[in-house]
Each structure stands twice: as structure tokens, then as C-alpha cells.
């Protein structure tokens, strides 16, 4: 653990979170920082409407950005509802076991590049096992009210920061919103003298 932390607010339903995750989790390899993963419910599950034109634009833009970054995109499974809830709760278990990088990358790739139904045991189980998690512990986490409260706290903290969309990065007193802000974050880390 280093003395500096970057909070990474993420939604499994956000394609931009999917695009940001590999680069976000790579930051500790290049900088003296830790990533604190903060999974949040999708906007649509928090009562915030997303216009249909924005959804269409987002899918085209994400495909273009994925191509630019050399990341696979599609087929897609929309995890809204149980898929998002299950992934968020398992991700909290993964945080406890320091396996959040493995789980988040595997689950988001399954959702955004492999079309895996993460709302089903058949879809989620292999992802959890591949990430190094015990499946029975994952099932317990999915129904654990304490885990649910942690996810709710992540949402509350995001809103208290005056943010709603993701991904959001918080470093010291700086907030950066969007997968295209990782380079700005790296400049802040360089200016802070944190490059390895």
C-alpha cells in the first residue's frame, strides 16, 4: 500500500467504465498509488433517466473508442437489474479479498465484449471462479445486507461529490469524469512526483 489513493467510481452498466478499467487498474504499476474501487448502481437504477439518443450515441462512441484502444466490444449484455446488483455485490467481496481488479476486468469484459448474462448463475459463476473467488462466498455476498449497504454508500459518496455519471476518478481534491480523463489523471500524478 502506498500513501496515495485514487478512488475509482465505476458502473458495470457503463461502457465507458469498461473502457477505463484496464488503464485505471494499471496506474499502480506506473505510480505510487492504490486504486480504491467504488462500484455504483447504474443511473437508470437510481431514478435518473437517460434519453434514448444518448444511449444510441454512447454505443457508437464506445465502439469507436474501443477500436482506438484495441479493446473488444460486442456482443453486449445489458446488466440492468439483477446483473448489475450481482456484479456490484460480488465486486465488494472481491475488494475484501484484493481481487477487485481480476473480477471487475473479467465481468466488464464478459458484459461488454462477450454478451454474457451476468444475471444468471451460469453466466456469473465462471467469471467469479476465473477471478479467484469462491462461488459459494459470492452467492452469500449477493444476498448480504452489509454488502448491499456498502454499494449504497458508494452511490451516496459519488452524489456528495456532485457527480452522477461514471467513471469518476478522485485524487486528492481533484475529480475527473470520463474514461478520456485518464491522461489528465496521469499528468496530476506526474506533477505530484508519484511516477515509479
Provide a role label for each language-model segment.
Residues 3-7, 13-33, 106-196:
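C-terminal cap of thioredoxin/glutaredoxin-like
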Residues 12, 16-114, 188, 196:
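Structural alpha/beta surface segment adjacent to cysteine/selenocysteine redox centers
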Amino acid at each position: 500500500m502506498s500513501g496515495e489513493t485514487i478512488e475509482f467510481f465505476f458502473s458495470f452498466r457503463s461502457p465507458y467504465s469498461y473502457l477505463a478499467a484496464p488503464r485505471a487498474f494499471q496506474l499502480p504499476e506506473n505510480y505510487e498509488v492504490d486504486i480504491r474501487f467504488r462500484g455504483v448502481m447504474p443511473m437508470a437504477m437510481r431514478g435518473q433517466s437517460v434519453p434514448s439518443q444518448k444511449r444510441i450515441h454512447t454505443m457508437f462512441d464506445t465502439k469507436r473508442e474501443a477500436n482506438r484502444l484495441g479493446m473488444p466490444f460486442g456482443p453486449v449484455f445489458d446488466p440492468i437489474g439483477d446483473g448489475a446488483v450481482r456484479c456490484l455485490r460480488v465486486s465488494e467481496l472481491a475488494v475484501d479479498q484484493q481481487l477487485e481488479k481480476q473480477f471487475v476486468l473479467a465481468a466488464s469484459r464478459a458484459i461488454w465484449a462477450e454478451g454474457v448474462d451476468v444475471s444468471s448463475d451460469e453466466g456469473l459463476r465462471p467469471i467469479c471462479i476465473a477471478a479467484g473467488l469462491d462461488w459459494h462466498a459470492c452467492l452469500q455476498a449477493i444476498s448480504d445486507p452489509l454488502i448491499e449497504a456498502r454499494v449504497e454508500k458508494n452511490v451516496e459518496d459519488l452524489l456528495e461529490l456532485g457527480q452522477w455519471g461514471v467513471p469518476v476518478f478522485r485524487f486528492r481534491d481533484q475529480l475527473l469524469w470520463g474514461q478520456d480523463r485518464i491522461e489528465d489523471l496521469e499528468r496530476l500524478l506526474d506533477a505530484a512526483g508519484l511516477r515509479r
